[in-house]
Amino acid sequence: MSQIKYKRIILKVSGEALAGEKGTGINPEVIKHLAEEIKSVHDMGVEIGIVCGGGNMWRGETGANLGMERAQADYMGMLATIMNGLALQDGLENLGVPTRVQTSIEMRQIAEPYIRRKAMRHLEKGRVVIFGGGTGNPYFSTDTTAALRAAEIDADVILMAKNGVDGVYSADPKVDPNAKKYSELTQLDLISKNLKVMDSTASSLSMDNNIPLVVFNVNKPGNIKKVVMGENIGTVIKGDK
């Protein structure tokens, strides 16, 4: 059997990916598929932390653009990420995968508060940990949350699970047929080429802590396992400069 390349991962799942073709809400079939994909990697002994976005329900930036106070709008977005996390927890536990949800905003009736050392212990015991509520602070994206949690738990990689996009391109491949797919980039490449993979705060955190990223299509069965095993199916963004 091939060697596992990444033994402790942060899987960043966008809210849009959970919505499926509808674009909004939570698609139970998508949850089921994603849970099965995660289980296949969990069964290999990989330690898995997950950060969900909330864009399938609400975006703080959109609310702010409509006249809401930005902090208030962002808190609503944080709650959306927790709803997504609970749905994914249910999908995983239906398959027998022990899963804990930890939130940066306390709501003890439904989830544990985020405690780094407790999260590490869960991972060591073979439990999947879903980090909900973003960083707990407005003005920070869930991409930044993924980079922050990856640094805190000493993850080997951040897997950027994309909805139907199989990597990073020089332009939108749906619009530009000549768009070039990159197999490998650095964090500085993202800035110099203006490639919208993650926001600058998340990118800086990843670069400063030397955490690589892999951008890949999560919709294709087996892709999470392929990435964990080191197959070149997406775009690798090296953690260094």
From Swiss-Prot:
Q: Where does UMP bind?
A: 54, 74, 135-142
Residues involved in ATP binding? 12-15, 55, 59, 163, 169, 172
Cite a GO CC annotation: cytoplasm
Which domain of life, per UniProt? Bacteria
Keywords in alphabetical order: Allosteric enzyme, ATP-binding, Cytoplasm, Kinase, Nucleotide-binding, Pyrimidine biosynthesis, Transferase
Q: Name one GO molecular function term.
A: ATP binding
Instruction: Outline the segment boundaries, as ranges, of region: Involved in allosteric activation by GTP.
Output: 20-25
Could you provide one GO biological process annotation from this protein's UniProt record?
'de novo' CTP biosynthetic process
Regulation of catalytic or functional activity? Allosterically activated by GTP. Inhibited by UTP.
Pathway named in the protein's UniProt entry: Pyrimidine metabolism; CTP biosynthesis via de novo pathway; UDP from UMP (UMPK route): step 1/1
Matching HAMAP family: PyrH_B
Family designation:
Belongs to the UMP kinase family.
For this protein, the record's PANTHER family field holds: URIDYLATE KINASE, URIDYLATE KINASE PUMPKIN, CHLOROPLASTIC
Name of the molecule in the record: Uridylate kinase
Q: Which organism is it from?
A: Lactobacillus gasseri (strain ATCC 33323 / DSM 20243 / BCRC 14619 / CIP 102991 / JCM 1131 / KCTC 3163 / NCIMB 11718 / NCTC 13722 / AM63)
Which gene produces this protein? pyrH
